[in-house]
Amino acid sequence: MQYFINFIRTPLPGKGPEVLAAVKASLDATGRPGNLTAPISVPNPTQNGVSFVSLIGGFQNLDEVDTMMESSFDNDEVQSRLASIDALCHRTAYILSENLSGPVERPDGFQANLISRTFFNAKMGSRNDLLATLLDVREKIDSTVKPMVSRPLAGQGGLIRVTSMAGSLQELEDNRKDALAKLASAGVLDLLTQSPWRSVGRVVHRVQV
């Protein structure tokens, strides 16, 4: 998976269950691999409501993304389905990202039940150094599944995301402590404009094709 799209939706008050059900159906209809997470720990508890994050993946290049978008915009049924979900939400955002760390290899029988997303914002001129350091630390982390390093195609130029998967909260926490120690030793904090921020979500739906 070289490229993937995240859909971040914040339901209107009382509409969470409807949004969850609608997003699950929408994911199933894409015919692409993906998942849906519900937050269990958010980076900013004062924000308006919680957000559900869905992912559509399996794009090997940007031409495949173009093809999917063109077919989506030309399909009235798809547009109606997305509009009906948006009508239940306070806010909706789409984020196209590039996977910078290669395929995510999972051992047989592994199932990701939790996903954490940590964002690092590089100082001006330090993005390449930050990326190289994160990729190096990724290889040294003692986890069942290596995290994925990615970048959004829009937004702040120095922003890099590290996505970690685990089967349990304890496993996720053990991986976090291991990663923090190795990141500190590698001098990552010296390359950042601010402290990293992190969210944790539970996988409530997955699509495998």
What is the meaning of each model-derived region?
Residues 1-209:
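Short S/T/G/P-rich N-terminal loop/turn motif that feeds into the first structured element of a domain
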